[in-house]
Amino acid sequence: MNLSLTLMTDVALALLLVMIAFWLPQLNIYTEKYSSYECGFDPMGSARLPFSMKFFLVAITFLLFDLEIALLLPLPWASQTTNLKLMLTMALLLISILAAGLAYEWSQKGLEWEE
């Protein structure tokens, strides 16, 4: 009985919401509102636009560092291990690799946005 009452209430509520949606006035449809958004590029324009290689390199660098930072997320759970010295050594090694990668990227002027 309880399940059937719940189902009938859900169906009645859904039908009520559908009827209200049909009675509400339709909003103006703008063509720009319904066109696809492609990261600031015109989707109906030419697909052969020049692409900024600097933007691509910064995006790839962000993805690499983001994935490496995700490797640090299990550290609080890893700190409960019995071999704490090995865990801390591995965490320090990972952070050192991240710092070395950041220093290399900085020295190669990969983080500067100048044309």
Swiss-Prot record:
EC code: 7.1.1.2
GO molecular-function term, one example from the UniProt record:
NADH dehydrogenase (ubiquinone) activity
- Among its keywords, does the record have Iron? no
Q: Name one Pfam family in it.
A: Oxidored_q4
> Where does the sequence pass through the membrane?
5-25, 55-75, 86-106
Q: How does it assemble?
A: Core subunit of respiratory chain NADH dehydrogenase (Complex I) which is composed of 45 different subunits. Interacts with TMEM186. Interacts with TMEM242.
Under PANTHER family, the record lists:
NADH-UBIQUINONE OXIDOREDUCTASE CHAIN 3
- Tell me the function of this protein: Core subunit of the mitochondrial membrane respiratory chain NADH dehydrogenase (Complex I) which catalyzes electron transfer from NADH through the respiratory chain, using ubiquinone as an electron acceptor. Essential for the catalytic activity of complex I.
The protein's name in its UniProt record? NADH-ubiquinone oxidoreductase chain 3
Q: Which organism is it from?
A: Avahi cleesei
